[in-house]
From Swiss-Prot:
It comes from Homo sapiens. One of its GO terms (cellular component) is cytoplasm. Skin-specific kinase that plays a key role in glycerol metabolism, catalyzing its phosphorylation to produce sn-glycerol 3-phosphate. Involved in skin-specific regulation of sterol regulatory element-binding protein (SREBP) processing and lipid biosynthesis. Glycerol binds at R98, D275, Q276. The gene is GK5. Its EC number is 2.7.1.30. GO terms for biological process: glycerol catabolic process; glycerol metabolic process; glycerol-3-phosphate biosynthetic process; triglyceride metabolic process. This is Glycerol kinase 5. ATP binds at S28, S29, T297, G340, G440. Pathway: Polyol metabolism; glycerol degradation via glycerol kinase pathway; sn-glycerol 3-phosphate from glycerol: step 1/1.
Length: 529
């Protein structure tokens, strides 16, 4: 394959040879691969559980050797399940969880440590000290003054910039400060840094290709989306050498081919994309004002903002959705952690056997009998922004049953959805065109209906909820001419059900007020100062 087909007319003239595309998603809970045909039907699948490691309280890691074995295995298993041969795969698209990173030896390819997950809290004290530092105050003040004179959007964004534990930036600083082996390698220019996409690309090509894409780069906290390059300002501020960061390429791009030794044939790698941006693409949220609500391990609310970046003061941050040739699509995003995490935790406590049971359990009750759950195993994100908040149940009584606990957990997910949506309406001045949901938790009809009621909007749930896989496959398919253009993708999308408001938001007012009170009491719990 000599290069990408970026012109729709050029693609249309290409022979539409038979074949399949692979969409692979390395999520926070599972790693999944689907084989898609031209009708975007899943012909074969494989899934394995991602094994997160918890070496210390608040630390979350992934063993790269285990992840690599799983990655190769799910591709082989999915292709086998589809009943096809590897040489029938015309392109591979890879979607990955974002801001989870690793460093490795440039000469040997050996990693210095495990992947440090986006959920990891080891840098929480660094985040606190940096955000309260004199240097940050000077940085913000300087940017505000310069913005006053120049009216530059970029400087306005910089004046609001704060570090979070979810960004790669200060977790990488923590590694540089605490692992002498990495420090030495950086000094000797023998260190590679990469998020999961970069590392997989490096492994798949046996070290011959080192790169990331714009969607993944923009979620690290080290990228300048206005200049479309790594941020000299931020990297200088926290002393991370720019030479440590990989080249940034288009999302739909000919990154190279998988080394033949791995699968027996050189499969073209033609899309790298961050999971939320991939889900946005898979949902066909191509127009300004299109909204995606992903409920997986965490909840992510994204709105397509066209070609303009939107910075807010409350908690929506600008991202690059994807870059394909000259087209750059921007998103504004906010998130809430511990969505699927809370359900999984409840399952481990034997409140239910299968997550599918929770919908029926919640619907069997009129309400939670005043029980509130605060989903804060990894702190509370926007609009509360409290990394020291604790997860908690409040309002427990002798009459409280596991059914009340389960309903309270599901209600908390819907309440967080409402918080994010209200903040989006307040801060992003773009009319909402449509809302589409995906992720494992969107299979729960109770959460979906309650969210629809609370925000008073229709929410479309697709027939295929694995949108990150489909998005990666769609981007790969467009790159090789497997699909002609976005219009063709829109025609292939299938909706399963549209949830419409059935109750007025006011009917939830008392429950929402009680929950907000519980959240307030859970905040700042772990703060040592």
């Amino acid at each position: 394959m000599s290069g990408l087909l970026t012109d729709p007319e050029q693609r249309a003239q290409e022979p539409r040879y038979p074949g399949f595309v692979l969409g692979l998603d390395v999520g926070s809970s599972v790693i999944r691969c689907h084989v898609y045909d031209r009708a975007a039907r899943v012909c074969g699948s494989s899934v394995q559980k991602v094994e997160n490691l918890y070496p210390q309280i608040g630390w979350v890691e992934i063993d790269p050797d285990v992840l690599w074995i799983q990655f190769v295995a799910v591709i082989k298993e999915a292709v086998k399940a589809a009943g096809i041969q590897m040489n029938q795969i015309v392109g591979l698209g890879i979607s990955t969880q974002r801001a989870t990173f690793i460093t490795w030896n440039k000469k040997t390819g050996n990693h210095f440590h495990n992947f440090i997950s986006w959920q990891d809290l080891r840098a929480v004290e660094l985040v606190k000290s940096w955000n309260n530092s004199l240097l940050m105050k000077i940085f913000h003040s300087s940017c505000r003054v310069l913005h006053f004179f120049t009216r530059s959007k970029r400087l306005f964004t910089a004046s609001l910039f704060t570090f979070t534990t979810q960004q790669t930036s200060l977790r990488l600083v923590w590694i540089l400060q605490n692992l002498t082996e990495v420090q030495k390698a950086v000094e000797e220019e023998n260190c590679c840094f990469g998020t999961i996409d970069t590392w997989l690309l490096y492994k798949l090509t046996k070290g011959s290709v080192y790169a990331t894409d714009f969607s993944n780069a923009s979620t690290t906290g080290l990228f300048d989306p206005y200049k479309m390059c790594w941020s000299g300002m931020i990297t200088s501020l926290i002393s991370i050498p720019l030479s440590l960061l990989p080249p940034v390429r288009d999302t739909s791009h000919n990154f190279g081919s998988v080394d033949e030794e791995i699968f027996g044939v050189p499969i073209p790698i033609v899309a790298l994309v961050a999971d939320q941006q991939s889900a946005m693409f898979g949902e066909c949220c191509f127009q300004t004002g299109d909204v995606k609500l992903t409920m997986g391990t965490g909840t992510f609310l994204d709105i397509n903002t066209g070609n303009s970046l939107q910075q807010t003061t409350g908690g929506f941050y600008p991202l690059i959705g994807w870059k394909i040739g000259q087209e750059v699509v921007c998103l504004a995003e906010s998130n809430a952690g511990d969505t699927g995490t809370a359900i999984k935790w409840a399952q481990q406590l034997d409140l239910f056997t299968d997550a599918a049971e929770t919908e029926k359990m919640a619907k069997s009750l009129e309400d939670s009998e005043g029980v509130c759950f605060v989903p804060s195993f990894s702190g509370l994100q926007a609009p509360l922004n409290d990394p020291w908040a604790c997860a908690s149940f409040m309002g427990l009584k002798p009459s409280t049953s596991k059914y009340h606990l389960v309903r309270a957990i599901l209600e908390s997910i819907a309440f967080r959805n409402k918080q994010l949506y209200e903040m989006m309406k307040k801060e992003i001045h773009i009319p909402v065109r449509k809302i589409r949901a995906d992720g494992g938790v969107c299979k729960n009809g109770f959460v979906m209906q309650m969210t629809s009621d609370l925000i008073n909007e229709n929410i479309d749930r697709p027939a295929d909820i694995d949108m990150s896989c489909l998005g990666a496959a769609s981007l790969a398919g467009l790159a090789v001419g497997f699909w002609t253009d976005k219009e063709e993708l829109k025609k292939l999308r299938q909706s399963e059900v549209v949830f419409k408001p059935q109750k007025k938001c006011q009917e939830y007012e008392m429950s929402l007020e009680n929950w907000a009170k519980a959240v307030k009491r859970s905040m700042n719990w772990y703060n040592k100062t």
